[in-house]
Design a protein with these regions (language model features):
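TOPRIM fold recognition
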Residues: 44-45, 57-216
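Phosphate-handling DNA/RNA-contact segment within nucleic-acid enzymes
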Residues: 1-90
Length: 216
């Protein structure tokens, strides 16, 4: 089921046995989403936004009850859903779990999964994370190793790898906080360096005066 921001059913996604995905004909999809387990987003401490339902479901299985997992269904819808979530749940901490579309990048030169995930993260003022697979997995089969569900189902890292990567991302400092800390650290370092530099200048001035007197 696909819901809009008001919780109204707007469409259905059908997944065939071969993995083909279809939406109900002439249905609304833009800015609509699916919340795994129909969790109350207003009570969630962290909201994780991802593309497909399978990815969102795998992420939910790997996290606790303070985390809500939301599927946008496709990369193009990520920024649209991000705008809805940002406006409606400003109290939440957000994380975007993006797809790494290397197969598309190899053919077309662009990576829509990454690009749209980063765009959504900018809207939500949060970080975007992408699955890290075991060495050689992604390079040998681009299509088979794309999202966090692939990490759980197909990678040597498996569900434990998914849980580790997602939970580490949840508990990492937000990107904006890291930038604040970095700026603060540089400012403190600069303020500490100033007295030292002033002392050096004073010493050089004293040395010049002494040398000048001696020459007289």
């Amino acid at each position: 089921p696909v819901y809009n921001a008001a919780g109204e059913l707007r469409s259905m996604q059908y997944i065939q046995a071969d993995g083909t995905k279809r939406f109900a004909k002439d249905s609304e999809q833009e800015g609509c989403m699916h919340v795994v387990g129909q969790q109350d987003l207003a009570k969630a401490k962290t909201i994780i936004l991802s593309e497909g339902y399978a990815t969102a479901a795998s992420i939910k299985e790997a996290t606790d009850d303070t985390v809500a997992s939301v599927a946008a269904f496709n990369s193009g819808n990520l920024p649209l859903v991000a705008k809805v979530l940002s406006a409606k749940y400003p109290q939440a901490q957000f994380l975007v779990a993006g797809d790494d579309d290397l197969a598309v990048e190899a053919k077309q030169g662009n990576n829509p999964g990454k690009e749209k995930a980063l765009e959504a993260a900018k809207i939500l003022n949060c970080r975007a994370v992408f699955p890290v697979f075991a060495p050689g997995e992604q390079s040998s089969e681009h299509k088979a190793f794309t999202d966090f569900n692939d990490l759980a189902q197909k990678s040597k890292f498996g569900r434990e790898g998914l849980a580790k990567q997602i939970n580490e991302a949840i508990h990492a400092r937000p990107a904006n906080e890291l930038q604040t800390l970095k700026t603060r650290g540089l400012q403190e370092e600069a303020s500490q360096d100033r007295p030292v530099e002033q002392t050096k200048r004073q010493q050089r001035a004293t040395t010049r005066k002494t040398a000048s007197r001696g020459s007289r």
